[in-house]
Regions:
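Ubiquitin-like/PB1-type beta-grasp interaction modules and other compact soluble beta-rich domains
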Residues: 1-64
């Protein structure tokens, strides 16, 4: 299975949920937002399985002043 994560091709041997992908890719579990195919997913939907060819964007919140 192939997906795109933050503009990089990622090949997976198995189908993952959004939550599993976040852990596997080493993203922090807090302070991030995840969009799949241009739609931001609330955390309640992170158990959604990713489909082949999905585009995933992970954005980390940054504080500024």
């Amino acid at each position: 299975m192939r997906i795109v994560v933050n503009n990089e091709d990622v090949h997976l041997d198995e189908q993952l949920t959004v939550a599993q992908l976040v852990v596997r890719m080493g993203f922090p579990e807090k302070g991030i937002a995840v969009a799949v195919d241009w739609s931001v997913l609330p955390r309640t939907e992170w158990e959604t399985p990713l489909r082949d060819g999905a585009r995933v964007d992970v954005v980390t919140a940054v504080q500024g002043g």
